[in-house]
A protein has these predicted regions:
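Short, small-residue-biased leader/transition segments that mark boundaries at the very start
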Residues: 3-5
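Short nucleic-acid-contacting surface segments enriched for D/E, G, S/T with interspersed K/R
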Residues: 16-30
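OB-fold/S1-family single-stranded nucleic acid-binding modules
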Residues: 34-60, 175
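Short acidic/polar inter-strand loop motif in beta-rich domains
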Residues: 35-42, 158-170
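Short helix-loop boundary/capping segments
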Residues: 74-127
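Aromatic sugar-binding surface patches on proteins
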Residues: 129-140
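Short, surface-exposed ligand- or partner-binding patches at beta-edge/loop junctions that are enriched
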Residues: 145-161
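Short beta-strand elements
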Residues: 165-186
Length: 186
């Protein structure tokens, strides 16, 4: 097997995680690894699969039961390699059944180069006892304008979180200024 590091494929010398990924498939993961001194291969120490939700409009059938906005805390959020990446902190009991998605609004894309995104999070009635992290990587390449492929696109991201009193509120913290995505550059 091999892993792609910064657009360079490297054979895996040793996978200490015991993970298995089917042949001829790819998966977006976060990993701790070490490139061998001669640069010929890498040793993988840990792998974490990422949730990769493809943004869909509010009227998509996947949202037929409504837009769920159970609260999360954003630990970290950044642009990287044509993705909006984030680490979220969830309050969970079992941690099972949480569903994530991205609701997109592209009504301002052609005119102003803006994509509005809202985090869909259905905790599926999981009780809020413990902290657990979720790693999400939202693909952005579908917003590239074929006529102007280098055009910068402003990504505005909203999500539901907790206010200082512990009540759920929608945060627009990442809307002004948002994230300036330049295809192929960040």
């Amino acid at each position: 097997s091999e892993m792609c590091i910064r657009d360079r494929a490297l054979p895996v010398a040793e996978d200490r995680t015991g993970s298995t990924i089917a042949a001829n498939t790819s998966r977006r993961v976060m990993s701790n690894y070490e490139v061998l001194p001669d640069g010929s291969a890498a040793t993988i120490y840990s792998l974490q699969s990422l949730i990769v939700p493809v943004p869909k409009p509010e009227d998509d059938p996947v949202y037929k039961d409504g837009i769920k906005q159970d609260p999360v805390e954003v630990v970290s959020i950044w642009l990287g390699r044509d993705y909006l990446n984030m680490i979220l902190n969830l309050k969970v009991s079992t941690g099972k059944g949480h569903t994530f998605g991205i609701v997109e609004d592209v009504s301002e894309l052609k005119t102003n180069g803006i994509v509005n995104m809202l985090l869909y999070h259905d905790a599926n009635s999981d009780e809020e006892y413990y902290n657990r992290r979720a790693y999400i990587s939202v693909p952005l390449a579908q917003y590239i304008d074929e006529e102007h492929p280098g055009r910068t696109i402003n990504i505005k991201f909203k999500y539901c979180t907790y206010d200082k009193d512990g009540s759920a509120v929608v945060s627009e913290k990442y809307c002004d200024p948002g994230f300036d995505y330049t295809p192929g550059q960040n």
